[in-house]
């Protein structure tokens, strides 16, 4: 099932038809199929090899596999997943015109966030557009991941290299189940400068 906020806001970032869309720390998200169905070429990046296998198994697709340095490239049609460390991926391996982050940056502790921004910047061409979905909650109420990523921190981390626009913030209903007093999700449009 596709993420509701992706379906609602993808058109807002105005990604070019056929754009190569980067999906960092993609796991086995079905959102990649949805983006592919919109006419995009998808490049996911995932550290856990089992998640890559599960993605293609669930899609009932057998990918071509090729070793590229420290990464393995799994390709089936317009979908590619590079299995390996996002932070060691060379820029030319995933040069993208658009990107989608539903759970990547919130999976990282605060000490790794600037490195993440730097790597996204290096993997995207100037003018690239991104859609990022974050979570915010009182961090002391839950260890994470997902970690809390307040809107102000997103702006501070990206502002020097991206034009940042907050598209929407929604109150999530499952905060009580997680033992949280409040849980929000924000959607950002980011344009690489």
Task: List PLM regions with ranges.
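Class I SAM-dependent methyltransferase "Motif I" SAM/SAH-binding loop
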Residues: 22-29, 104
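Conserved catalytic-core segments centered on acid/base and nucleophilic motifs
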Residues: 32, 42, 99
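Short active-site oxyanion
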Residues: 19-21, 40-41
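Gly/Ala-rich phosphate-binding loop of Rossmann-like dinucleotide-binding domains
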Residues: 36-37
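Class I (Rossmann-like) S-adenosyl-L-methionine-dependent methyltransferase catalytic domain
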Residues: 1-18, 28-31, 44-91, 117-119, ...
């Amino acid at each position: 099932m596709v993420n509701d906020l992706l379906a609602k806001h993808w058109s807002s970032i105005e990604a070019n038809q056929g754009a190569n869309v980067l999906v960092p720390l993609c796991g086995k998200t079905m959102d990649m199929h949805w983006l592919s169905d919109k006419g995009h070429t998808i490049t996911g990046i995932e550290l856990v090899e089992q998640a890559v296998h599960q993605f293609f198994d669930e899609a009932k697709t057998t990918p071509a596999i090729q070793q590229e340095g420290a990464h393995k490239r799994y390709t089936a049609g317009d979908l590619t997943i590079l299995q390996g460390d996002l932070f060691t991926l060379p820029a030319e391996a995933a040069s993208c015109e658009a990107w989608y982050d539903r759970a990547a940056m919130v999976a990282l502790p605060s000490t790794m966030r600037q490195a993440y921004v730097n790597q996204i910047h290096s993997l995207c061409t100037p003018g690239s557009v991104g859609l990022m979905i974050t979570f915010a909650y009182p961090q002391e109420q839950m260890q994470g991941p997902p970690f809390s990523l307040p809107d102000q921190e997103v702006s501070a981390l990206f502002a020097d290299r991206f034009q940042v626009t907050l598209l929407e913030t929604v109150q999530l209903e499952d905060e009580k189940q997680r033992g949280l007093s409040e849980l929000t999700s924000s959607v950002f449009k980011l344009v690489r400068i």
